[in-house]
Curated annotation (Swiss-Prot):
It is found in: Cell inner membrane. The chain crosses the membrane at residues 5-25, 39-59, 67-87, 102-122, 134-154, 171-191. Part of a membrane-bound complex that couples electron transfer with translocation of ions across the membrane. The lineage of its organism: Bacteria, Pseudomonadati, Pseudomonadota, Gammaproteobacteria, Vibrionales. The complex is composed of six subunits: RnfA, RnfB, RnfC, RnfD, RnfE and RnfG. It comes from the Bacteria. GO terms for biological process: electron transport chain. This is Ion-translocating oxidoreductase complex subunit A. Its EC number is 7.-.-.-. NCBIfam families: PRK05151.1, rnfA. It is a multi-pass membrane protein. Belongs to the NqrDE/RnfAE family. One of its GO terms (cellular component) is plasma membrane. Keywords: Cell inner membrane, Cell membrane, Electron transport, Membrane, Translocase, Transmembrane, Transmembrane helix, Transport.
Length: 193
């Protein structure tokens, strides 16, 4: 049980996919302008990352390895992620049309989010079992969502602040992301895996 808790904390805080592994930067910068959109994207990504992680484990364990076709791993994981994203898009469209409109193009772009594919591939490379795959996928998703929501709230505050003209827009966003990354470095000694 402790191992699973350490894996979760390590994935969320210590080895955050956005701030440490630099995966998922496109939605991190693109969807973080408004808090409401960031929360929606975080929830959708959490669902997709967790489900894609589980599906990737099952495909690897019950299809690719038994048939000896591990070389098709990346292509099959992309296909699995695309199916999971389409399922998520249908669910969001039916349950919350407002959120569906807010997320716009970013919902289908979860398919190309490198963090989703990265989590699936790292699960296999680190030889996680089924439970660890679920926790790793969920932890990566929670870490992504946490950073996205924190960054969106900071960007909203910066938008109304008196920022010098040369720093407006992407410049101050990158500086803020860097400072946020430094803050998360404080968690480095928290968990050793």
């Amino acid at each position: 049980m402790t191992e699973y808790l350490l894996l979760l904390i390590g994935t969320v805080l210590v080895n955050n996919f956005v701030l440490v592994k630099f995966l998922g930067l496109c939605p991190f910068m693109g969807v973080s302008k408004k808090l409401e959109t960031a929360i929606g994207m975080g929830l959708a990504t959490t669902f997709v990352l967790t489900l894609a992680s589980v599906c990737a484990y099952l495909v690897e364990s019950y299809v690719l390895r038994p048939l000896g076709i591990e070389y098709l791993r990346t292509m099959s994981f992309i296909l699995v992620i695309a199916v999971v994203v389409q399922f998520t898009e249908m669910v969001v469209h039916k349950t919350s049309p407002t959120l569906y409109r807010l997320l716009g193009i970013f919902l289908p772009l979860i398919t190309t989010n490198c963090a989703v594919l990265g989590v699936a591939l790292l699960n296999i490379n680190e030889n996680h079992n089924f439970i660890q795959s679920i926790i790793y996928g969920f932890g990566a998703a929670v870490g992504f969502s946490l950073v996205l929501i924190l960054f969106a709230s900071m960007r909203e505050r910066i938008h109304v602040a008196d920022v010098p003209a040369p720093f407006k827009g992407a410049s101050i966003a990158m500086i803020t992301a860097g400072l946020m990354s430094l803050a998360f470095m404080g968690f480095t000694g928290l968990v050793k895996l």
